[in-house]
Structures are given as structure tokens and as C-alpha cells.
Amino acid sequence: MKIDILSIFPDMFSGVTGNSIIKKAIENERVAVEVTDFREYAEGKHHIVDDYPYGGGAGMLLKAQPIFDAVQAVKEKQPETKPRVILMDPAGKRFNQKMAEEFAEEEHLVFICGHYEGYDERIREHLVTDEVSIGDYILTGGEIGAMIVMDSVIRLLPGVLGNKDSAVTDSFSTGLLEHPHYTRPADFRGMKVPDILLSGNHAWIEEWRDKESLKRTYERRPDLLKNYPLTDKQKTWLKEWSDSK
């Protein structure tokens, strides 16, 4: 996969691409990440990327020209692919695991990171394929949001995680929150690991994990259960918990 990031603050990404799993993914050629300062594509002596909005109003808007030209430039470097051009914006579609899995199937992603009051609307209408938000709050720019999406996508690429099952069993990947985890020692200051996890009976352990995953989702994110395909056993567990309230 190739990931291009367009930002007027490219140095912000050095910490993300130079550490941990993303660094290893780049070194192992599972993904290539290139950060471009789209200010370099702005016309004029001073390379200005923003301007006042027509009709007045507070703040400045990112101009269409530098972003259009920057996207065109990164496309020309990968002419054999048709990239998803992703605009990081609080008005976009809420990012989730399903979207991460969809993006992970692509060959080329281009992230546009904004600043100031917003974007010239022609960028939305004629350039991007996706508008993505990481939540109902405002950040200084789109860089942190792009980092979050990029991290979520890269870890799903084949060969990136040491254990291929890790991404499959994570919270949200199954539609439910993940079950509790424990490691050694079995007794830490009187706080004990559930006996069933020490039993060695894999069938019991899997059922316990399934039940605890459902219970955690029921208690913390019941909205996730609205369209979840529950088994008969899971329906029985939910009824027990509901009746005990």
C-alpha cells in the first residue's frame, strides 16, 4: 500500500512513521508513507495556501489550487492506481473499524489535512472521494486525525502484526468490545485471574471470552448490539443480565 499525506506541517508525522508498528511496516515494505507539504504547490511568490471567504465571515479558507495540484502530483507518481482521496474534516463520516477495513483493501490512500476555518467547497465537490471525521470535536488541524486513521489501517495490512489473529480479535473487529485479558502472575496482591482461564479447557475459555465480550459491550456500548446478529445463547445471557437489574 502507498499512503500520501498532504499537510502544511509535514514534520508532525515523523514521530508516527519513525516508531513502533508503523516504522516496522515501512521497513518491511508492507506500506510506503510519503508526506508532502502542499504549500510547495501554491502559486505565487509567497506560496499562500489560504484566503478570505467570499461573502465574509470569520477565519480563512484553504484555497483549492494548491490542494488540487498536490493531489494531481501524487497521483502521477502512482499512475497505475486509483487512490481514495480522504479529506479529514469534522463534518465527514464518523470513522470506525469497518471503514478501516475498507481502506485497508485499497492500494493507494491520499489524506488531505486541513487547517484554518475550512476548505474551499470545490475541494469537497470535485476532488475527494471520502470525508472522514474522528469524532464530534474540533482539532487545530487534520494531522492528528490522519495519524489515527493511518495507524488503524496499517495494522490491518497482511504481515504487519506479529500475530495474524490480533487484528481479527480486537474490539470492534468482531462487532463487540473485546473480552478482558490477564497475564502472569495468577494472583497479584490478592487480585486473582478467573479460575476458568487457568483450567486448560479451551472450549470453556472460548465461551467465557464470548460471554465477557458480550457483557462488556452490553454494559459500555449497548448501541453496538442494535444490529448485531446474536446467537440464541447470547440472547439468553442478555436476558439474564437485563432481568437482574
From Swiss-Prot:
GO biological process: tRNA N1-guanine methylation
Residues binding S-adenosyl-L-methionine, per UniProt: G114, I134, G135, D136, Y137, I138, L139
InterPro entries registered for this protein in UniProt: Alpha/beta_knot_MTases, tRNA_m1G_MeTrfase_C_sf, tRNA_m1G_MeTrfase_TrmD, tRNA_m1G_MTases_N, tRNA_MeTrfase_TRMD/TRM10
Localization terms from the record: Cytoplasm
EC number: 2.1.1.228
GO molecular function (one): tRNA (guanine(37)-N1)-methyltransferase activity
Keywords assigned by UniProt, alphabetized: Cytoplasm, Methyltransferase, S-adenosyl-L-methionine, Transferase, tRNA processing
Cellular component terms (Gene Ontology): cytosol
Catalyzed reaction equations: guanosine(37) in tRNA + S-adenosyl-L-methionine = N(1)-methylguanosine(37) in tRNA + S-adenosyl-L-homocysteine + H(+)
Record SUPFAM superfamilies: alpha/beta knot (SSF75217)
Main enzyme class: transferase
Family per similarity comment: Belongs to the RNA methyltransferase TrmD family.
Quaternary data: Homodimer.
Function as written in the Swiss-Prot or TrEMBL entry: Specifically methylates guanosine-37 in various tRNAs.
Protein name: tRNA (guanine-N(1)-)-methyltransferase
Name of the gene encoding the protein in the UniProt record: trmD
